[in-house]
Amino acid sequence: PFEFHHIESNHPRYVMSYHWHVEYEIIRILKGSLTVTLNEKSFIAMPGDIIFVHSGILHSGIPDDCVYQCIVFDGNFFLKNNSACAGYIQKILHQEIMIYHHFSPKHPDICDVVNSLFDALWKKPVGYEMTVIGQFYHFFGLVFGNHYYLESVSRTRRDYKRILQLKQVLDFIEHNYASPLTLQQLSASVSMSPKYFCRF
């Protein structure tokens, strides 16, 4: 249920191109810097920083002499066989709350737990599976206990529509990448004129 990636300059996906997925993702920066874009907002993540990417968020990362790691996971995993925590997890899955997307070493509680989580998946000592699951619950517990989230997030209809259109274009490119693509085709995939699409 957990996909782990260690990414250095020789990795085929060193530059994290703009993409999205239904799974959640946690990124930690080990060295250098990573210019992270979430939807249409960018910031620079430095060594020791932790980035939390919600389900469905368009995101990319431009590395600068960077070594970073990612864990991609299905949030529904945490609903199984654990009714005591289900109410909290559902708030995350239903986007009633949005966990802060950027934690720095100024949040040592979060950094310690997330670093332990990454180290367990990276080094895989005996029993690491229990450490991983336990540290995920520990992370969520800290998020709720310290209010490291935004409540009842409302996206403006205009912003929501733009993000939806960006996702449609990315899907179109992904499904037709083997063929030459024209501006006309890209703009038509989101029902726009080529002129307006270029300003989009």
Give the positions of each predicted feature.
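A hydrophobic/aromatic-rich effector-binding and dimerization subdomain
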Residues: 1-7, 58-122, 141-150
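Short, Lys/Arg-enriched N-terminal segment that forms or immediately precedes the first helix
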Residues: 10, 150-157
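Regular secondary-structure segments
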Residues: 30, 111-125, 170, 174-177
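Residue-level recognition of conserved beta-strand edge/terminus positions
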Residues: 54-56
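N-terminal positioning helix adjacent to the helix-turn-helix/winged-helix DNA-binding module
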Residues: 109, 158-169
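All-alpha amphipathic helical-bundle segments outside canonical DNA-binding/catalytic cores
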Residues: 121-138, 160
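Basic/polar phosphate-binding segments, predominantly the helix-turn-helix DNA-binding elements
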Residues: 145-148, 168, 172-200
